[in-house]
Amino acid sequence: MQNATLSPIPLLQRSLQLLNPIYTPLLILASPSFFIPIIGEIIPVLGGVLNLAYVVVGAPILGGAALLLVDQHLKQQSPVLGNSLDQAISKAVPLVLGSILLSLIVFGGSLLFVIPGIYLGVKLAFLICAIALEGQGAVEGLGYSWNLVKGRWWGVFWAFLALGLIFGIPILILSLIVGGIAAALNLGLLVAVVIGAVTTAIVPILNIFTVLLFRSLQEIQGQTA
């Protein structure tokens, strides 16, 4: 890997450099987040069931597969969608359990005020990476992420915040524009299609960015496997 850094701009530039060869398989792994909201607009009950199943089970497994695929590419191995998905499925239990634990912890922290939730979210942001890439269990992954971010909280927070602003602000503006048009034409499905397409299209970049940040932290903290 190139020089370790927590600076968001170099990480984003590197993410874009790595994107092309693995964009299509990463997009396939992210595709349920595009189709499920559309189904929800057409058949609300079915959409609700699918969304719940995806959030609880599908997203952790597919997200883990995406991280594995990116990591294979970083290691100059031939990234194969099927292999990454098989590996993620073999870790399905810790991935799903870890995702549930993370959601409960961050939600619980947010109930105490927003700041504890943000703090915990950043400290535990690499739980899925720890499970998928380092073979940690769900509980062990919490500790792994916590220790990895130790002393680097602000750097990690800024990296994710900057990335969120870079992509989030344009998406917000687009949502307002499309939402206004959809409301005028009474086309709620238009919002789901356009916003879903845009957000799904950038998920592969977020996958790569997250793995690069994770590996950079490992190198900085001397925890590289």
Enumerate the language-model features and the residues they cover.
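Hydrophobic alpha-helical membrane segments
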Residues: 1-225
